[in-house]
């Protein structure tokens, strides 16, 4: 009796930590791992106490063992043994999740409890994510940020986890033969989860979701679901309204009115006024000049898409390209002739051209000042933080970090010399700009200014976050996130705001003249961007894959070790591949690079075995309620994982691989417990 009581207490403890594990998949990796390791610990304690092996064979033992052996050999051969050993340990310690599930879900009732707990909290996480994405939907922030908010984890991880939730719900929706009330409930949950993955704005999760759902349709042979799926994809593609144009507004000093819209060949990025000439940086369309008839003459086809065009001096001009290089041109008889090009040492987030010098702020290498006339580096400061905005004039240089740290330097002969101000604001700073010796800032609640190294509050903030701002005739003109064009007047410490008009589409850039406003606007749909060779995230992936393949060719048997690949990538990449990442955004190439062909074979054996087991379980119970739906959803989730792994290193993502081992263990447990129950 005493033994039974002790075992019951241990079982309740296991159940408690299992609950933490199951309820935190989509919202807290810390709680999730606490739940897993403590549940596993008490399962082992239970086994020692009862003198019974709590674990059962799953059929994955031999491929798991081969994987561990390859990891050990690869670690020994790696030039970063310590790091490889750490990563190996992380991966190996997650493998027992499969066995933890089989040991703790000891009957069908417990299997259902495990799944229902997971899916309930996954749904709650989806609702929370949608609520926090409200501004992204309403104000169109997706087009600016390129992703949804990071609430519980990185948006790309959120999208993959959400795809699993959607696939499970889809499986229950089309497999269960229940009444309409049940179907409606599942459909509502499915729709809400679908909205949450849309809110991530991440194509990897979308791709995996589509693959998993398509696999389920294939397994069920319910071809009539294919048509609506195709219709939705095609309709989404055409409904995304891809466009690029230059818009002309009349301006009488008090309001703007749209006059003309001129479509462009590329993506109208920036508009630049140089003397009486106006230039449009049209991304892949190249550089265009606006003639007197408001028509575009394309005058330069740049080797990579152009983001911005500025004048260096009377004879030199600078084009900033998407790969962050600066391309310098001479102007001769109205024609631009290429002179030279150069780049900052890192991944440029922002730059300013001032007094023939280019000031760049790099994500990974700080501040660099270069002479635009010859590309010579005049100044380098690696800095002590990661900044992404820079502004400069004769007197001051200002840096801003994403967490609203503002640093101000004094200038001497074009070089920053003394730090005058350094402060991290408690509330977000949306934008800062220089005017003489004053730094103006718009925060969430207040407008601030910095003068003589001291910050003060100017006024309350009564407009949405400002995206672009420019000074003309003593006033500041700006575009905010509410699509409004406003004038800001600072007079003796007070601020007045004049609202001059509203844009239908958020401008990317603008130039104001005496009686005219010119804006550039473009929008590219997220689905269409999958096939865009000039999208930075796309060509960065291609560069990573090429480098990863070369790493494999140089280390074919056991790879370079299970390490962060950033340092190696620098050696393999081309000079203008500036974005440095520690993984290769592809499971299969990454595995080849870090573990060689032996590791690739071991992991493909594991994945192939799991795929076979998923099919076996589904085919065994496809006529059963709940069990068949769960097995079908598990198989669909695994297919989703395999497909999304084509563009993401999700095998190495702690949250994702934890989920995969859990689903695998749950499906195996389902098979074993149902078999035991007859």
Tell where the protein language model's regions lie, with residue ranges.
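Hydrophobic transmembrane alpha-helices and their immediate junctions
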Residues: 595-639
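Long extracytoplasmic/lumenal interhelical loops at the membrane interface
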Residues: 531-546, 550, 554, 558-595
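Transmembrane signal-anchor hairpin modules in multi-pass inner-membrane enzymes, especially those
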Residues: 1-83, 105-112, 116, 172-184, ...
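Flexible juxtamembrane loops connecting transmembrane helices in multi-pass membrane enzymes
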Residues: 147, 241-275, 494-505, 509-546, ...
């Amino acid at each position: 009796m005493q033994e039974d009581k002790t075992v019951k207490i241990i079982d309740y403890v296991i159940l408690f930590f299992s609950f933490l594990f199951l309820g935190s998949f989509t919202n807290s990796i810390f709680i999730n791992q606490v739940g897993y390791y403590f549940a596993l610990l008490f399962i082992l304690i239970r086994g020692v106490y009862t003198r019974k092996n709590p674990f059962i064979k799953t059929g994955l033992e031999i491929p798991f063992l081969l994987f561990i052996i390859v990891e050990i050999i690869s670690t020994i051969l790696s030039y970063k043994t310590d790091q490889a050993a750490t990563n190996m340990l992380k991966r190996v310690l997650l493998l027992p999740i499969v066995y933890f599930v089989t040991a703790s879900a000891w009957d069908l009732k417990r299997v259902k409890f495990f799944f229902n707990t997971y899916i309930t909290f996954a749904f709650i996480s989806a609702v929370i994510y949608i609520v926090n994405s409200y501004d992204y939907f309403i104000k169109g922030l997706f087009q600016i940020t390129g992703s949804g908010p990071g609430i519980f984890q990185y948006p790309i991880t959120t999208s993959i986890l959400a795809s699993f939730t959607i696939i499970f719900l889809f499986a229950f929706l089309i497999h269960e033969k229940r009444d309409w009330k049940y179907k409606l409930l599942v459909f509502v949950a499915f729709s809400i989860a679908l909205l949450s993955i849309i809110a991530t704005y991440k194509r990897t999760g979308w791709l995996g979701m589509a693959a998993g759902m398509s696999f389920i349709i294939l397994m069920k042979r319910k071809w009539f679901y294919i048509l609506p799926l195709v219709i939705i994809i095609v309709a989404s593609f055409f409904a995304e309204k891809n466009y690029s144009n230059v818009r002309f507004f009349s301006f009488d000093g008090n309001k703007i009115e749209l006059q003309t819209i001129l479509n462009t060949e590329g993506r109208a990025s920036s508009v630049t006024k140089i003397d009486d000439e106006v230039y449009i940086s049209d991304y892949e369309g190249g550089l265009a000049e606006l003639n007197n008839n408001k028509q575009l003459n394309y005058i330069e086809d740049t080797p990579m898409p152009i983001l911005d065009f500025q004048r260096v001096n009377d004879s030199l001009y600078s084009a900033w390209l998407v790969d962050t290089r600066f391309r310098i041109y001479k102007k001769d008889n109205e024609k631009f002739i290429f002179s030279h090009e150069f780049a900052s040492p890192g991944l440029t987030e922002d730059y300013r051209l001032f007094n023939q010098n280019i000031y760049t702020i790099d994500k990974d290498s700080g501040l660099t000042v270069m002479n635009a006339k010859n590309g010579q580096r005049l100044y380098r400061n690696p800095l002590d933080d990661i900044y992404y905005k820079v502004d400069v004039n004769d007197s001051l240089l200002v840096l801003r970090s994403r967490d609203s740290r503002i640093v101000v330097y004094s200038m001497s002969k074009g070089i920053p010399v003394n730090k005058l101000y350094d402060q991290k604001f408690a509330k977000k700073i949306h934008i800062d700009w220089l005017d003489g010796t004053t730094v103006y800032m718009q925060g969430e609640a207040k407008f601030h200014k910095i003068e003589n190294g001291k910050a003060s509050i100017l006024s309350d903030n009564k407009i949405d976050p400002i995206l672009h701002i420019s000074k003309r005739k003593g006033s500041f003109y700006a575009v905010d996130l509410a699509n409004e064009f406003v004038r800001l007047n600072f007079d003796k410490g007070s601020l007045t705001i004049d609202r001059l008009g509203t844009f239908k589409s958020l401008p990317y850039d603008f130039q104001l003249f005496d009686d005219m406003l010119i804006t550039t606007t473009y929008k590219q749909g997220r689905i269409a961007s999958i096939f865009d060779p000039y999208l930075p995230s796309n060509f960065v992936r291609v560069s990573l894959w090429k480098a990863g393949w070369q790493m494999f060719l140089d280390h074919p048997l056991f790879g370079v070790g299970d390490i962060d690949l950033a340092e190696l990538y620098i050696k393999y990449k081309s000079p203008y591949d500036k974005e440095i990442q520690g993984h290769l955004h592809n499971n299969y190439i990454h595995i080849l690079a870090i573990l060689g062909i032996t590791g690739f074979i071991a992991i493909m054996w594991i994945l192939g075995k799991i795929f076979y087991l998923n099919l076996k379980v589904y085919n065994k119970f496809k006529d059963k309620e709940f069990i068949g739906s769960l097995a079908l959803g598990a198989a669909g989730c695994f297919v989703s994982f395999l497909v999304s792994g084509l563009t993401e290193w999700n095998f190495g993502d702690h949250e994702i691989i934890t989920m995969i081992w859990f689903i695998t263990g749950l499906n195996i447990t389902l098979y074993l417990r149902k078999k035991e129950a007859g």
